[in-house]
Amino acid sequence: MNDVWDELQWRGLVAHSTDEAALQEALQTGPLTYYVGFDPTAASLHVGHLVQVLTAKRLQQAGHRPLILVGGATGLVGDPRPSAERTMNDPSVVAGWVTGLQGQIAPFLDFDGPAAATMVNNLDWTQSMSTIEFLRDVGKHFSVNRMLDREAVSKRLATTGISFTEFSYVLLQSNDYLQLHRRHGCTLQLGGSDQWGNITAGCELVRRVDQRTVHALATPLLTKADGTKFGKTESGAVWLDPELTSPYAFHQFWLNAEDAKVVDYLKAFSFRPREEIEELGRQAVENPRARAAQRALAHEVTALVHGEEAAVAVEAAAAALFGGSDLEAIDERILRGALAELPTAAPADRDVRLAQLFADTGLAPSLSGARRTIGEGGAYVNNIKLTDPEATLRDVQLLHGRYAVLRRGKKSLASVAVPLPQ
């Protein structure tokens, strides 16, 4: 087997593990079967989930067999948060999310060959258990004292309190490991470091019930340079679903990675070899303005999630927006996603003066300021220099019949979207 342990260590993907020597030996002598779980708490995964998805992919590439669990049962309960109780979602909604998340994860893995991946749903074994079976076969092996010591539980007890439903979540997740060990020979659980308590509880349940030693590996929770949570922008989470976060916005998120963190992100999210990442790291130090590391990161992750064609298209769109190529060549869906990230005016008709639109979108401080920018030669509409301060939107060849890109100078952008006819 490939020495995937050293690779995971170098990439900074090991925050915690059970007995390191035993796990390393199991990985080297494998193949072993491992699982990673995702709860369907929304219609899409976000970029934070990619750490688990891509780590699962790395293990599969090393010859190990992945089980991908999307929790149709645990998603109905909810892992306790330190702050407040989770919203209980309708079972039909959760079932739809299970299907959606399975579809998002599947393209990252191989479902054929000796290390073929398998999708599993914990509702399959949880819904058939009676309450008596659950309490005797699972609950009997858990100490309430230890459950009360869990950080999320203790914080909730000190503030808003916690329901028995969420308090019992750890039993459900632990039973997943037991069931997957029995049904599929699973001997490794992969998860985020925030799940470490749940993961090790599953290891302990397997040891108590089946008298077998199994393994656990937790990846770190990535952060920004200031220590805040990775994967959030001012507009919210960065989703994998292109309808929730456009491919353009997705690419921009990675392109804006901080210099201090870009190498960490390349290690975690890229499949480039060590030599290439180290070279990109050197370039980031020696010539940070070129942003070569960020460009490499943005292209690769966008291609992984949305496909190579989309990655190339959004890069072409970015170049066109700043005057580097033809705006008319941009696909409408990509253009719409790009313009959604800009200040936008939606005039009721096309008789409005372009100078007014520069003021309305904030590219100029006022109408007089917009006229001054036009007079100085610093105003562009669809990459064509605007020379007439009295020109209206009717004088513009709209992109895809309804869009215009306004630019002041080299970098300040805004958009115009003419409403569709009713």
UniProtKB/Swiss-Prot annotation:
Tell me which EC number(s) this protein carries.
Answer: 6.1.1.1
Q: Which InterPro entries match?
A: aa-tRNA-synth_I_CS, aa-tRNA-synth_Ic, Rossmann-like_a/b/a_fold, S4_RNA-bd_sf, SYY-like_C, Tyr-tRNA-ligase, Tyr-tRNA-ligase_bac-type, Tyr-tRNA-ligase_bac_1
Report the catalytic activity: tRNA(Tyr) + L-tyrosine + ATP = L-tyrosyl-tRNA(Tyr) + AMP + diphosphate + H(+)
The subcellular localization recorded is: Cytoplasm
Q: Where would I look for the motif 'KMSKS' region in this sequence?
A: 229-233
Which Gene Ontology MF annotations are present? ATP binding; RNA binding; tyrosine-tRNA ligase activity
Positions annotated to bind ATP: K232
Family annotation (Pfam families) = SYY_C-terminal (PF22421), tRNA-synt_1b (PF00579)
Enzyme class, first EC level, given as a word:
ligase
Which superkingdom heads the taxonomic lineage of this protein's source?
Bacteria
**Which residue ranges does the UniProt annotation give for the motif 'HIGH' region?**
40-49
Membrane-crossing ranges are none
The entry's keywords = Aminoacyl-tRNA synthetase, ATP-binding, Cytoplasm, Ligase, Nucleotide-binding, Protein biosynthesis, RNA-binding
Where is it found, in Gene Ontology cellular component terms?
Answer: cytosol
Biological processes, Gene Ontology terms? tyrosyl-tRNA aminoacylation
List residues binding L-tyrosine.
Answer: Y35, Y169, Q173
Domain S4 RNA-binding, by residue range, is 352-418
Q: What does this protein do?
A: Catalyzes the attachment of tyrosine to tRNA(Tyr) in a two-step reaction: tyrosine is first activated by ATP to form Tyr-AMP and then transferred to the acceptor end of tRNA(Tyr).
- Family to which the UniProt record says this protein belongs: Belongs to the class-I aminoacyl-tRNA synthetase family. TyrS type 1 subfamily.
Q: How does it assemble?
A: Homodimer.
- This protein's name: Tyrosine--tRNA ligase
**Organism in which the protein naturally occurs:** Kineococcus radiotolerans (strain ATCC BAA-149 / DSM 14245 / SRS30216)
